[in-house]
Design a protein with these regions (language model features):
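Basic/aromatic-rich interaction segments and small domains that mediate binding to polyanionic partners
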Residues: 2-52
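A short, exposed loop/beta-hairpin motif centered on an aromatic-Gly-Thr core
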Residues: 77-89
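Short N-terminal "domain-start" leader segments
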Residues: 54-72
């Protein structure tokens, strides 16, 4: 099983929306829909097909000294260290992770 990191620029046709052009990110195992977190804290339900795939992570992949661990729905990504301590990735860490891999896509955060 893999978890995917997606990035998004709000592409709706409502140019008057205060979120138009903002960047959003999501980590999810879903291939259809997911909740996308935007820079101002807004969360939107979005079809994955409208997002840009940034990176796939295997569930045993290392991020620093921790391994990727997934539980629950809508991209609640957790990391587990060598001592089996589990923690949820924070919003700031999600953005840092997106920025680490974003150069592989046309989207710039």
């Amino acid at each position: 099983m893999e978890i995917a990191l997606y990035c998004d620029i709000v592409r709706n046709n409502n140019t008057k929306s205060k979120r138009f052009g903002q960047h959003g990110i999501v980590l999810t195992t879903s291939t259809s829909c997911a909740y996308v977190n935007y820079q101002d804290g807004f969360t939107a339900y979005c079809a994955v097909k409208h997002l840009t795939l940034v990176k796939h992570f295997r569930l045993d992949e290392r991020i620093g000294d921790e391994s990727v661990y997934y539980r629950g729905y809508w991209g609640r990504l957790k990391l587990v260290d060598a001592n089996d301590n589990v923690r949820t990735l924070s919003r700031e860490e999600m953005w840092a992770l997106a920025q680490k891999y974003i150069h592989r896509t046309a989207v710039v955060v």
